[in-house]
Amino acid sequence: MPLHKGPQKHQERPMSVNPFFGEANPVAGMAEAPPTHRLPDGPLPPTTAYQLVHDELMLDGNARLNLATFVTTWMEPQAGILMAECDDKNMIDKDEYPRTAELERRCVAMLADLWNAPDPANTVGCSTTGSSEACMLAGMALKRRWMQRNADRYPGAARPNLIMGINVQVCWEKFCNFWEVEPRFVPMEGDRYHLDAQAAADLCDENTIGVVAILGSTFDGSYEPVADLCAALDALQERTGIDVPVHVDGASGGMIAPFLDEDLVWDFRLPRVASINTSGHKYGLVYPGVGWALWRDKEALPEELVFRVNYLGGDMPTFALNFSRPGAQVVAQYYTFLRLGRDGYRAVQQASRDVATGLAARIEALGDFRLLTRGDELPVFAFTTADHVTAYDVFDVSRRLRESGWLVPAYTFPANREDLSVLRVVCRNGFSKDLADLFVDDLTRLLPELRRQPHPLTHDKEAATSFHH
């Protein structure tokens, strides 16, 4: 049974086939209607199969109007052509596709240089299916290093723990669950919606495998204070001797800060930062799915975690949770690095930030909303209803915007700000100022009707919207 059941109960039914779908024979089209939940008895003409799938997908949301996702929804046609040329290339077959493997190696070296690694040419890193897998790999390395340091106590009474803000992406909770690590969360407090450096250091002990810093938070787009965190952990080590490494989850900010916040020290310039991940298919500007994980040196990634596989004629080192995966996204990442360079990335990311800050200011000017963030770190901002607004809530706004095609998530913050519900807007490459103007126009048109409501209409907030951050 599939884990995701969808909003409605699925019933077995034949698909409806237009007579013209049957290629040269209109009558055949009506006779070839396939079932939906079992394999058809016979084949269909390719045009018929295509049209059936194409028409069903028309009911999906418009990706360009999806202000919930961080994922890249537009690339140049040339990138699409390159990806199509690589559809049959398996990334694991490095001996058969040596140039694809070389492009992966170059991407790692480019990221190492971008993130100020001590020795970019020899930095250890790999591509992944996304930043979630990259986080899993980084977490495994943190745990294995802790196990090596505590071989005399593990797996006895010692239980490893990982420190992070309550705002972390769900992949970190999965990591702790799958690899039996105790998660220790720093809650939100007041107007602080992410990890506090000193609070994180206070949670550390001899069983702490590391601290995760988010650049930036998916809840509101803010950067966590990586340098302050490292300073607090330096002080902890000086007092107690406990040495705790830091992993920076730069799923989005890892491809924003190097171009727009060059003076911000968050990366391998900080000796305590052991590893960094980013998502190529977010602000790396590549279609899903590709991510990257880098370690500052070979000591940060235990050699025992790297498998060497004699497969199809070559000895290949691999560090991944899967085996076969497409090479097209890695090729697309290299294309984008070549196509844009530093100046191009800076221009694209600055355009997204300009749209975000401008849109946030216009929403604030409507008078019905209060900004939590302004899109001046990640090009992402969160806002809630103003104190005087009682006729509707953020869930009503999200639902009504969806009627106009806009996908804007509404959700409640975690501990200790469960009282706060917000809307979040993600501005990406392809979400232009013109689209932002249309968004404000639609939101403005909705307000008079929302203001006339006697009270918020959302009773089941969990059913009102989905938020997969």
What are the residue ranges of the model-derived segments?
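N-terminal entrance/gating region of PLP-dependent enzymes' catalytic architecture
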Residues: 2-6, 10-122, 405-406, 443, ...
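Generic, well-ordered alpha-helical scaffold segments in large soluble proteins
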Residues: 106-114, 141-145, 175-182, 203, ...
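Short Gly/Ser/Thr- and Asp/Glu-enriched loop/turn motifs at secondary-structure junctions
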Residues: 120-122, 157, 373-380, 418-420, ...
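Conserved PLP-enzyme active-site core in the AAT-like
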Residues: 129-307, 312
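A generic structural motif
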Residues: 217, 339-342, 387-389, 429-433
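PLP-dependent enzyme catalytic core of the Aspartate aminotransferase-like
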Residues: 236, 417-469
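Active-site C-terminal subdomain of aminotransferase-like
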Residues: 251, 259-262, 266-379, 384-388
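Conserved PLP-binding catalytic core of the aspartate aminotransferase-like
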Residues: 369-405, 429, 467-468
